[in-house]
């Protein structure tokens, strides 16, 4: 590769112990080399790019000042932790990041003792870190420090506020680092964003900040005891002057900052100075997402996970998609605009994922009818419920794995009142390289028991458009649409917007030996597998697209129960409690006794890899489905022998 970086210091760092042997004056060079290593690796092995560039100095400072892994670092989300992985002994394996069998996309305790808590979703770091701090205190370990790292985007989550509220009542060694870069994946939104901006820019606070900076400079010549005494005195002055305008100080959490999160020497010095102060503390850092790579600094959203690129020029290697089917996300976004143009009651809601779910299409064309509520899934659902209660028709788009966080809101604030909220579950099924925290495996199983819900999963883009149209018609109540990440199957995806009768599936193909019942896009793999199995076995296999998990198409299922002795169900959700379970229950309730083989995501947390690899791993790819259908064909009676016996 051109301009291959030279790592004079990074090559000698295999653990934080090696880092701590360096002089503080060497840390800027370590940061430069670490940043270049991240750029080099991710240019050819794609992952979460911009966030990790923004936390290089913070990562180095934490492992330099604190005695990790004895001291605990808890990352929020984990998008920003690649530097942490490299410094903690995983540099040689980093090229396997997010690959099947390779290191994991987010910090994981199963992978390293330096990864103290599983992450992937937002806003949980403060609560987890507080729990660790309390555990240390209960065990009499008053030397252990626990540090939570949370971004300003995650601070909009209710769980973060719950953790802050509880932290304020404990005397434990907890440090909360607020990594303020004005970004989640997209721009941060809401009152907390504005509050942090005001906290930084107010004249009154800047005066205090300037005085504190002068004081810290002078403290450099003092011994440790005097330094700590003066810091306590300075914090008392700051508290008296700023407590009324500082939400953290008002919650009895000592506030330090804001400081430049890219000044490694000063950051290390501040961490040392506040390290041994007892009680909960928060250090506010200003960082730049994408720091050190100009294209990422300028366009942080596009460079959140950019794919492959040239590490020198920044040119992104974008695949040629001409002639390919569209993304399900873009079909959703464009269809929503089409519906909103005809139905003035329609509004869109997303919790901090406007670009990921294509809600940004509605935002750009009808900005007053689209709402990014920040990382706040429960609020997004209840907010939608409130709008629906007074006559609007919300389309609330939340990734399937994140909708888990809003379960009570769905029941209490939408379903009980039978409110017409359309819950759009993006990223349903296996999502690939982000792994178990992000797979949309459980939605059918956890939503199926809730009364009043309609639950549908389209097989293709035409079905998605028609179901979206159906969902916004009068008197449909709460309506769930689940669809996968990635491309559909139809190049010509536009079709007339027509109503689909609620609870009605469809027969895709006649057959007489085996009935295959599928739901959602995996039905396309099932269709191909059926054709192959019929060709190899000579048997006749029927195919039904159930389309609706709730209400079930009872007429269709009665037909299947009366006609077939062998049924195969195929779904892209967990096998426990999903569509296959619903079919089994129906057959038992109506005293049909077929053999039912269920195919779906197994009862385990599926790790990371490409979507194709994971479908193969779970026995849900076309080849595996074909083999299973052939196995079922072998269980059928030999018709030639039956004919001989009857003659």
UniProtKB/Swiss-Prot annotation:
Its EC number is 2.2.1.7. Thiamine diphosphate binds at residues 79, 120-122, 153-154, 181, 293, 377. GO terms for cellular component: cytosol. Its cofactor is Mg(2+); thiamine diphosphate. GO terms for biological process: 1-deoxy-D-xylulose 5-phosphate biosynthetic process; isopentenyl diphosphate biosynthetic process, methylerythritol 4-phosphate pathway; terpenoid biosynthetic process; thiamine biosynthetic process. Pathway: Metabolic intermediate biosynthesis; 1-deoxy-D-xylulose 5-phosphate biosynthesis; 1-deoxy-D-xylulose 5-phosphate from D-glyceraldehyde 3-phosphate and pyruvate: step 1/1. InterPro entries: Dxylulose-5-P_synthase, THDP-binding, Transketo_C/PFOR_II, Transketolase-like_Pyr-bd, Transketolase_BS, Transketolase_C. Binds 1 Mg(2+) ion per subunit. Binds 1 thiamine pyrophosphate per subunit. The keyword Heme does not apply. GO terms for molecular function: 1-deoxy-D-xylulose-5-phosphate synthase activity; magnesium ion binding; thiamine pyrophosphate binding. Homodimer. HAMAP family: DXP_synth (MF_00315). Catalyzes the acyloin condensation reaction between C atoms 2 and 3 of pyruvate and glyceraldehyde 3-phosphate to yield 1-deoxy-D-xylulose-5-phosphate (DXP). Belongs to the transketolase family. DXPS subfamily. This is 1-deoxy-D-xylulose-5-phosphate synthase. It comes from Bacteroides thetaiotaomicron (strain ATCC 29148 / DSM 2079 / JCM 5827 / CCUG 10774 / NCTC 10582 / VPI-5482 / E50).
């Amino acid at each position: 590769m051109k301009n291959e970086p030279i790592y004079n210091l990074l090559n000698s760092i295999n653990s934080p112990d090696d880092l701590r042997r360096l002089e503080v004056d060497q840390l800027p060079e370590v940061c430069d080399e670490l940043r270049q290593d991240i750029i080099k690796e991710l240019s050819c092995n794609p992952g979460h790019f911009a966030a990790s560039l923004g936390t290089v100095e913070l990562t180095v400072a934490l492992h330099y000042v604190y005695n990790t892994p004895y001291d605990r670092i808890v990352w929020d989300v984990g998008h920003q932790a690649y530097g942490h992985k490299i410094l903690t002994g995983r540099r040689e394996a980093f090229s396997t990041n997010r690959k099947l069998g390779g290191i994991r996309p987010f910090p994981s305790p199963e992978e390293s003792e330096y990864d103290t808590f599983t992450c992937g979703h937002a806003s949980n770091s403060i609560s987890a870190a507080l729990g660790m701090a309390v555990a240390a205190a209960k065990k009499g370990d008053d030397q252990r420090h626990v540090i939570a790292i949370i971004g300003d985007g995650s601070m909009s989550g209710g769980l973060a506020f719950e953790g802050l509220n509880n932290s304020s009542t404990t005397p434990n060694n907890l440090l909360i680092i607020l990594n303020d870069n004005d970004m989640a994946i997209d721009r941060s939104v809401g009152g907390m964003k504005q509050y942090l901006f005001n906290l930084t820019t107010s004249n009154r606070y800047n005066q205090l900040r300037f005085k504190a900076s002068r004081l810290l400079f002078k403290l450099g010549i003092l011994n440790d005891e005097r330094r700590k005494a003066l810091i306590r005195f300075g914090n008392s002055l700051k508290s008296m002057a700023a407590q009324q305008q500082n939400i953290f100080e008002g919650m009895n959490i000592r506030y330090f900052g804001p400081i430049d999160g890219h000044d490694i020497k000063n950051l290390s010095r501040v961490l040392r100075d506040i390290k041994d102060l007892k009680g909960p503390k928060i250090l506010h850092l200003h960082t730049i997402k994408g720091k050190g790579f100009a294209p990422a600094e300028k366009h942080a959203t596009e460079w959140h996970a950019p794919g492959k690129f040239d590490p020198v020029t920044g040119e992104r290697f974008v695949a040629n998609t001409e002639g390919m089917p569209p993304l399900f996300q873009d079909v959703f976004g464009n269809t929503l605009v089409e519906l909103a143009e005809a139905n003035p009651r329609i509004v869109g809601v997303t919790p901090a994922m406007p670009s990921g779910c294509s809600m940004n299409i509605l935002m750009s064309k009808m900005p007053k009818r689209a709402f990014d509520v920040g990382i706040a899934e429960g609020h997004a659902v209840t907010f939608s419920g409130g709008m629906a209660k007074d006559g609007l028709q919300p389309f609330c788009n939340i990734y399937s794995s994140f909708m888990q966080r809003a379960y009570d809101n769905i029941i209490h604030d939408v379903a009980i009142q039978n409110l017409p909220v359309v819950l759009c579950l993006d990223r349903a099924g296996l999502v690939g390289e982000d792994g178990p925290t992000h797979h949309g495996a459980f939605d059918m199983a956890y939503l199926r028991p809730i009364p009043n819900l309609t639950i549908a999963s389209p097989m293709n883009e035409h079905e998605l458009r028609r179901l979206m149209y159906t969902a916004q018609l009068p008197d449909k109540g709460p309506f769930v649409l689940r669809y996968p990440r990635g491309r559909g199957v139809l190049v010509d995806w536009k079709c007339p917007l027509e109503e689909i009768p609620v609870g009605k599936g469809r027969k895709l193909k006649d057959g007489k030996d085996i009935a295959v019942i599928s739901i959602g896009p995996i039905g396309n793999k099932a269709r191909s597998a059926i054709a192959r199995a019929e060709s190899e076995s000579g048997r006749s296999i029927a195919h039904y697209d159930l389309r609706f998990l709730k209400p079930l198409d009872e007429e269709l299922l009665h037909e299947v129960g009366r006609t077939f002795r062998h049924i195969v169900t195929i779904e892209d959700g967990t096998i426990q409690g999903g569509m296959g379970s619903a079919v089994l229950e129906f057959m038992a309730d109506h005293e049909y006794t077929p053999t039912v083989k269920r195919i779906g995501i197994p009862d385990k947390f599926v790790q990371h890899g490409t979507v194709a690899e994971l479908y193969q791993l779970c026995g849900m790819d076309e080849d595996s489905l074909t083999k299973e259908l052939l196995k079922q064909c072998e269980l059928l009676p030999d018709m030639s022998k039956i004919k001989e016996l009857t003659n």
